[in-house]
Amino acid sequence: MSHIRKEKQKMKVIYPDYLKQFQCSGKECPDTCCKGWGIQIDARTWKKYQEEKGSFGKQIRKNSNKRDRTLKFQEGVCNFLTKEGLCRLQQAKGAEFLCKTCREYPRHLEIYGEQKEWSLSLSCPEVAKLILTRERPIAWLAIEKDVESNYKGEVEEELVELYYKMREWLVEVIQEPTKPIAIKVAEAMALAHDFQKYQKKERKENWEEVEERIQSVWNRYQKENETGRLETKLKKFQGETELKNIYVGNYLKIFHEMEAIEEEFLKFVRQVEGNMGENKETIGKERRLIKDAKEQSAKREVFYQNLFLYFLSVYFVGGIYDGMLYTKVKLAVFSFLIIRELIEQKELKEGRWLREEETWKIAWQYARQIEHSSYNLERLEEELESKEAFSLEMMLYCVLA
């Protein structure tokens, strides 16, 4: 990465319209954000911790790793977490004394060229509840700020704008109100597959030509959608339950190779692997016996739409740095498939619809397992990028089964 002298410049700051609705539930939280990941201390906070005087300063340094500037954990839990689930650092010195990660979580900042984008992490139980129950379409707000930045010129502005435009189109596909979520996920995946053909990181082309090609893909999608041709194309992938069971069963094996972040979640995944012989028809028969099945189905459509939108919106624009926009969408599809399968298999086994908070828990535990380990996230993206098991055709069979 090139180092450029910091200078004041106008920077657009983008955030989802629900960002400021988040409020930490504190003691009422069903879990804690102070376990299961390595919390690295930023340079400014590390210096402050090293200079802290008295017995409290000694306590901080005793519970910090000097080599990699991280907080020490015991059995996966931060040493500064109290029995009441509160942070001793914050209790003693206030929120401003915390390191950048602890101070901002579950808020997360990404920088795309000369733009900043804030999001909320699904790995937080309160965020999961906020995002997954949302009934209104997602919208992004933007403000301009004068900030110091050393990112000027690192990414072409045209590329960033193109990615935001493609994300806008994909979000439009997912938020179409009349189609089932599985159909919309399949359409978004096919659309991203075609976008990828015309956007390669290593190709230096006239931006107008690239934009025209991407626009032509979107225009073709709209035309095929209006004429019903798109629906016809997808029909051959529908109802293949046996194929879905084989493919998704294999997808679950990826978790065997991951760093363990959420032990309870990984144990649940292993249990589900043993139930993959059950088919979709059986699940359907079980559900028809449940009194409020129609109402529950409508709620679940909202849940899955919000789930997919989360992974799409958080990761897609990051493709400006590696050119892997299609892989970013496949990550959202993979997350949709795994969480849907885990929920359905648990419902099949127990013969009931899961309560909302149970589905939220599966989602935020999955997010922790993936997002709280850079190794796990990078490994998953490598698999999605390179393995035939994650081809467009195979994943469409899984989505539409």
Please place each PLM-identified region on the residue numbering.
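Local cysteine-cluster metal-coordination motifs and their immediate loop/turn environment
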Residues: 21-39, 72-108, 121-128
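Hydrophobic, aromatic-lined core segments that form the binding pocket/scaffold
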Residues: 180-401
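Short linear interaction motifs
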Residues: 14-15, 83, 320-322
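Membrane helical hairpin/interfacial module
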Residues: 37-84
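Internal, well-ordered alpha/beta segment that forms a basic, Gly-enriched binding/recognition surface
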Residues: 85, 93-194
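Short, compositionally biased low-complexity segments
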Residues: 21-28, 137-142, 240-244
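General N-terminal leader/first-domain-start detector
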Residues: 1-56
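Short, charged/polar micro-motifs that form catalytic or ligand-binding hotspots
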Residues: 24, 92, 156, 160, ...
